[in-house]
Amino acid sequence: KVVHLRPRSSFSSEDEYQIYLRNVSKYIQLYGRPRF
């Protein structure tokens, strides 16, 4: 599965972006580093 990181500009707030980055980090820990 290929994960595409969304740019900061696609989020309406910095908080949403930070939450997204945390979720990505959890995903990487669970499944290994995805291919971008």
Swiss-Prot record:
It is found in: Secreted. The modification Phenylalanine amide is found at F36. Central and peripheral nervous system, and muscular pharynx. GO terms for biological process: neuropeptide signaling pathway. One of its GO terms (cellular component) is extracellular region. May perform an important neurotransmitter function and may regulate muscular activity. Belongs to the NPY family. This is Neuropeptide F. The lineage of its organism: Eukaryota, Metazoa, Spiralia, Lophotrochozoa, Platyhelminthes.
